[in-house]
Swiss-Prot record:
Recorded family membership: Belongs to the glycosyl hydrolase 32 family.
Domain of life the protein comes from: Eukaryota
Database matches in InterPro entries: ConA-like_dom_sf, Glyco_hydro_32, Glyco_hydro_32_C, Glyco_hydro_32_N, Glyco_hydro_beta-prop_sf
Record-given protein name: Extracellular exo-inulinase
Upregulating conditions: Expression is up-regulated by inulin and maltose, and repressed by glucose. Ammonium sulfate, ammonium chloride and urea are inhibitory for inulinase synthesis, presumably because of the release of ammonium ions.
Residues annotated as the enzyme's active site: D34 (nucleophile), E214 (proton donor/acceptor)
Thermal properties of activity per the entry: Optimum temperature is 60 degrees Celsius.
Glycan-bearing residues: N56, N104, N110, N197, N203, N357, N371, N389, N422
Single GO BP term: sucrose catabolic process
Regions crossing the membrane: none
Protein's UniProt keywords contain Secreted: yes
Length: 514
């Protein structure tokens, strides 16, 4: 019998609406997909998130808007609904981003607008026969927008030319745009001094193909433990990713303001789950926050069918990004992305249990009952002794009705997994893959035994698992009809080979903040 370390989450049957995540953003109603236009307002100390939004239905369709939400801490959100809309009902405001034009390079602002709130949106305007790049600007800090009267600002006569990501490049004193020529598998890099006149600098090609590229990003990311940084190019693939449907890849390299050059020929996956797409970072993030971004927590293979009620789709939790050198195997160490979930000051523990040094078969190592929200986190450090009988599990169990979501580790294969095969929502959909997995080298060795770390969050119908400090992640949605959050969370150890060094489980809730 193969042994594995598993976490299982079961839930009571209540009402569909209660499966809404607590911390990950969801629209109040309607359809949502890609995150757009994230930026930080340093005057009001406020994070802004925009998103692809259809307020008229819970499936994708036109007219397509940008929705808008804000947060003080990236965990508690206020939704404002539709913000930028198309000129005609058959058109759409497709993905793009927002920059803070502190120095008024665009000329859109006068001195009455605080430099910290000179907000400019750059987005794809989609019609039946064209995709062109448009600009709009806000005179109230990002709540309402005026469209630039001379739109479009960029048109290459291609119907698959979309998803601009713009940022200020200080060394060359210019704005940079990365944008996808989607079905040519090409990321174009443009430059501008005023956000309205753009010149092509170079093209980047490479990586996993799939059907098309979307939602690129380019940002400088610090390398942990050094004073150095590297540039990271993010590219979304849909459909046809190696994980099935939608996913994100990234490349690490250098950027001189004109050309991105990867350090190697390897395309790295950002997440090994099924529900992580269109990742984007926040512009103007405070230095102490580092590089912050989030993704759409869904997959185009089944996004329109997710069994929620008045709303459909969520974002992931916000994540902080760094780079670190880590082993891919015993012989090769490479620079890789580390992702760590962000919990704002509004997130507190309603309940918490910690235990250490759990050895061998302990079938109720840790158990925590739902007290308020049924939103849980778990943090486990464990070692594996391959000389012992590896049969058994480490698992977390809850509820009635026999449905479950599992996450865990198989010591025989040396891999982590998430298993949503015992959930009935979308069970008949052939693309709602039961199991996803990730391989990572041990976090460290102690007493000649491999040691691993697994941190996870179960938030409504979303599970996000972070392995070995975020060197690999697994993000998956799951749908148990009528869930009202997890009823309890239990860690079990039934394997002689697994020694739990330390464990902590929390029930999380949100408190009011000023």
């Amino acid at each position: 019998m193969r042994a594995f370390l598993a976490l299982i989450f079961l839930t009571f049957v209540m009402n569909v609406e209660s499966s809404r995540p607590l911390m990950a953003f969801t629209p109040s109603h309607g359809w949502m997909n890609d995150p757009n236009g994230q930026f930080y307002d340093s005057k009001n100390e406020l994070w802004h998130l925009y998103y692809q939004y259809n307020p008229n239905d819970t499936v994708w369709g036109t007219p397509l808007y940008w929705g808008h939400a804000t947060s003080k801490d990236l965990s508690t959100w206020k939704d404002y609904g539709a913000t930028i809309g198309p000129d005609r009902d058959e058109d759409g405001i497709f993905s793009g981003n927002i920059v803070v034009d502190h120095n008024n390079t665009s000329g859109f602002f006068n001195d009455s607008i605080d430099p910290r709130q000179r907000v400019v949106a750059i987005y794809t305007y989609n019609t039946e026969g064209s995709q062109t790049q448009h600009v709009a600007y806000s005179l109230d800090g990002g709540y309402t927008f005026e469209k630039y009267e001379h739109n479009p600002v960029l048109d290459v006569d291609n119907i698959n030319f979309r998803d601009p990501k713009v940022f200020w490049h200080e060394p060359t004193n210019q704005w940079i745009m990365v944008i996808a020529l989607s079905q040519q598998f090409k990321i174009q890099i443009y430059g501008s001094i005023d956000l309205t006149n753009w010149s092509l600098h170079s093209n980047f090609t490479g990586g996993l193909f799939g059907f098309q590229y979307e939602c690129p990003g380019l940002i400088e990311v610090p390398v942990e433990g050094t004073d150095e940084s590297k540039w990271v190019m993010f590219i979304a693939i849909n459909p046809g990713s190696p994980l099935g449907g939608s996913s994100n890849q990234y490349f690490i390299g250098s950027f001189d303001g004109f050309e991105f050059v990867p350090d190697d020929s390897q395309a790295r996956l950002m997440d090994y789950g099924k529900d992580f797409y269109a990742f984007q970072t926040f512009d103007n993030a405070p230095k102490e926050s580092g590089v912050v971004g989030l993704a759409w927590a869904s997959n185009w293979q089944y996004a329109n069918l997710a069994p929620t009620k008045e709303w459909r789709s969520s974002m992931t939790l916000a994540r902080q990004m760094t780079l670190a050198s880590r082993n891919m195997n015993p012989e090769t160490k490479v620079l890789s992305l580390l992702q760590k979930p962000i919990f704002g000051e509004s997130v507190v523990a309603a309940n918490k249990i910690s235990k250490r040094n759990i050895t061998g078969q302990d079938e109720q190592a840790v158990k925590i009952h739902k007290n308020s929200t049924g939103t849980f986190s778990f943090d486990i450090t464990f070692s594996v002794d391959s000389s012992k009988n590896q049969t058994g599990q480490l698992q977390v169990i809850s509820g009635q009705n026999g449905e479950s979501i599992r996450a865990g580790f198989d010591p025989t294969a040396g891999q982590f997994f998430v298993d949503r095969g015992n959930t009935s929502g979308l069970k008949e959909n052939p693309f709602f893959t039961d199991k996803t997995s990730a391989y990572v080298e041990p976090w460290k060795h102690q007493n000649d035994l491999p040691v691993y770390k697994m941190f996870g969050v179960i938030d409504g119908n979303l599970i996000e698992v972070f392995l070995n400090d975020g060197i690999a992640t697994l993000t998956n949605t799951f749908f148990i009809p009528g869930t009202e959050g997890l009823e309890y969370l239990e860690i079990e150890s039934s394997s002689d080979a697994i020694h739990i060094v330390e464990s902590e489980v929390k029930e999380l809730k949100l408190r009011a903040t000023s």
